[in-house]
Amino acid sequence: GKTTVVFHYPAGSERLVKSVNLVVNRLLQQRLDMEQEIDTLTHTATFTFDICGPSSAFTFTTKVETLLLLTPGETVNVYVNPFSDAVRVRNTHFPNHKLQTVSKIHADGYYAAFNNYANNERLRNPPSMDVWYSDLTDYKASDEEYVRKIKEKYRKIMSDLESKDIPLSVKEYYEYQIKNETVMAFGNAYYLRKRNYRTVHKVKDGDIPFKFTNLPPALLSEIDSLFDMTDPRLLEGGNAEYLIYGVNDSDSDWESVLGDRGKLLYDLKDADLVYIPRIK
């Protein structure tokens, strides 16, 4: 459906920002990368485009970087305060004379609760499987130990997330993000353990005295005991690219595990994704 996003800027902000760049991930369609000048009379920048399902978008060259979730057919108004970062920086340097913090944006629309929280709040210790830097992907672990550690960490993080007092839409976003990261950990056991070895031993190049492999189908299938990785709602969460890459770029034998259930994920092999910053 045709979706419209209108960015509203306060009068006088043209000294700080002249235009808005908006990038939209559309998964089954080509990624959009658009730019609009801010109208000097209305102080707005309007984008209209087609999306076929819930899509993530962000701005990255304005004074305020925003992360948005959008749904087809809606009009979303985003009221931007380009001075919010200046207040944050000032308060950092003058902690004894802090100004009242101000919201970066105020948005309406279907995902209003999520978009306002994601851009204005700061969750301490945001949940993550942290597949790149934790000991979760310990190179010394056997395949069975590797899977056991993943499952234990997944269950602990999901339990912690359930206890957090945050909007439901934000909780779901994190839930799907954690699941996407878990797919990455299952599907890329070879690469992640090899990377862990190089990190631990500070070895960038050269041979490694370990033979790393991906998980066999019997262990890959244990992900089914955690969640349904073919649930299309996972694409609405953070790190959706982990779900796609964890299946299509891993050389793991997912077809033996998923069969026809994985058709959507296979079809997304060439999805034109761009990095979306995680909620801070």
Which residues does each PLM region occupy?
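Oxidative protein folding and maturation machinery
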Residues: 91-280
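A non-transmembrane, solvent-exposed segment enriched in polar/low-complexity residues
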Residues: 1-168
